């Protein structure tokens, strides 16, 4: 997904004003207001992909994205932001629930020799 979104997407997720995710770097010349800040979370993008899939008639799916998020050390920025690799997993459909995502995380962790015990 794109590395940009808008403050409106953070508003829809009810991200508090004092949350680190609100310390987004504003793009000086954005393509549109919908792509005006650098992402601090992957959640808005994941939700948009799920909505797009549902609109296209896909009744179920399991998705993941591993991509950087950009965290400003301070605003306005005076140095390069911290880029943190982040994993986001989403699932939708009548058979999907918390345990679907939990199982995906456990399988991924096991692949790296990790556990949640």
Cite the ranges covered by each PLM segment:
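Extended beta-strand-rich architecture
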Residues: 1-117
């Amino acid at each position: 997904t794109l590395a940009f979104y808008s403050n409106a997407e953070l508003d829809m997720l009810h991200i508090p004003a004092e949350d680190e995710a609100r310390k987004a770097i504003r793009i000086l010349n954005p393509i549109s207001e919908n792509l005006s800040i650098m992402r601090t979370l992957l959640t808005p993008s994941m939700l948009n992909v799920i909505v797009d899939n549902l609109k296209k008639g896909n009744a179920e799916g399991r998705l993941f994205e591993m991509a950087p998020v950009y965290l400003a050390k301070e605003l306005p920025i005076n140095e390069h932001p911290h880029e943190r690799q982040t994993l986001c997993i989403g699932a939708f459909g009548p058979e999907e629930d918390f345990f679907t995502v939990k199982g995906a995380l456990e399988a991924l962790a096991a692949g790296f020799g990790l556990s949640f015990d």
